Amino acid sequence: MESKLGLNLELVNQARQSAAHVADDTQRFIDQHTTVTVERAVCRLLGIDGVNEMDVPLPNVVVDHMMATSFLPMGAAWAIGNAMLETGKDPQAVAEAIDKGELDLSKVPAHSDEEIRAAITPVVNATVERINKNVAKRNSYLKEWGDKEGPYLYIIVATGNIYEDIIQAKAGAKQGADIIAVIRTTGQSLLDYVPYGATTEGFGGTYATQENFRLMRAALDEVGEEQHRYIRLCNYCSGLCMPEIAAMGALERLDVMLNDALYGILFRDINMQRTIVDQYFSRVINGYAGVIINTGEDNYLTTDDAITAAHTVLASQFLNEAFAKDAGMREEQMGLGHAFEMDPAVENTFLYELAQAQMAREIFPNAPLKYMPPTKFMTGNIFRGHIQDALFNMVTILTNQRLCLLGMMTEAIHTPFMSDRALSIENAQYIFRTMKDLGSELTYKENGIIRNRADEVLTKATDLLKEIEKLGLFTTIEKGIFADVKRPKDGGKGLAGVVVKDDKYFNPFIEVMKGKVAAE
């Protein structure tokens, strides 16, 4: 890619190297530990589904039983495979027997590791084949209809009722949206289980459940076939159930997933040890399922200043890239996040926003960057808000951002109406059409505001990453370097669900999926 900013590539390399060292150091911790939700995700991928009479998901029943008997370090795959050999039951029947109190995994006579792997392999292969078929179907649609060039128009629905969401999502797709994100109900990231079935009551969003995923996927396929284009579905595998929701998304052919441990640590007070382990398995699954992940750097600028803290966003992007690579993800799946969140009362902020967006594009040339619209300084004045969104759209097309979450002029007033989305889509389409090639016509002068801003942010980010390399990720978070939010290593939610792996532990899905993409 031609550089318009004349970035110091040596600094880029130094930053990337520091981030890789931080990720590799953290990976040593990850490799030694598992968590309750990692093992519940293994249960789900082994075909354990449904809830008991008390509406407790059966994966929770199995893993809670393993925690209560101090058996979780063995891992769900080993324990269930061993029980399959002893009882002749499949994983679902094993889970149901545990729920009835008929089976204690910790008391089942131990079979050899070779026998256990042989017993569980056909089940693993069946799940992997289901994911392969999902990826093949997505690829088939894209081959038939082609994929969109330029930014994806990305909108959200958030009614709380999946059936109402479907109506709004289909309307948005017909209006021109390329990605539909179903916002989760407020606080779902703090639930240490995944609700079951179709849901009609949520607050600020709709519960992420596998049935809701299935219903929305079918609805978007229906409208996609009418429109002769593939409509991507987005949801959220952040919080205390990251890998479980990633597994559900892989099984139901979701295309985009919000996925960022740092977001959960900083903004949901989830324990850092817990969520960094959870993130790894969730990214292995997303990588294999061909899912684009979205990271949450844009949120830093809601609690910190977008001008003075811009380097923390870039540093986090480097870290998220390194963690994604360690999970075997391709750069084309790394939707690194940033945002148009500077105070419009400050002079030349459009130039600063343009500089930072172009900088991200040049540093991460293969990444489908996720660009977020203004929210912090939206006042409820819909006329000014529409102009702010237009300026955001201009930066999007000038710098070739890929996932463009459309701003709403009614931001800070109410959840968008369908008419609000229609106007937002029209705004973006107008600007993207009339400015399609303007970016390639522009150059930025040496020692000008734009180049100097990019140099400043890159230099500060590189220095910060060198500091993080010395401190380690956990200490960095404790110091409040990201988003001006401090979190203790042993605080937050979910630490009790982290255990050290036994020597016999294995996760067959990491072995099969890591570094690969289904149907390729």
Q: Where is each model-derived feature located?
A:
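Hydrophobic faces of well-ordered beta-strands that scaffold small-molecule active sites
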Residues: 151-158, 179-183, 229-237, 256-261, ...
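Alpha-helix-loop-beta-strand connector modules within alpha/beta enzyme cores
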Residues: 143-144, 194-232, 276-293, 350-367, ...
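Short, glycine-rich nucleotide/cofactor-binding loops
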Residues: 156-162, 347, 380-385
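Long, compositionally biased, glycine/small-hydrophobic-enriched stretches that function as flexible linkers
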Residues: 1-163, 171-176, 184-212, 239-245, ...
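Hydrophobic alpha-helical bundle architecture
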Residues: 353-420, 438-448
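Conserved, well-structured core segments that form the ligand-binding/active-site neighborhood
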Residues: 202-330
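Glycine-rich phosphate-binding active-site loops on the catalytic face of alpha/beta enzymes
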Residues: 178-189, 252-269, 320-321, 392-415
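Catalytic cores of alpha/beta
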Residues: 163-170, 240-253, 308-309, 383-397
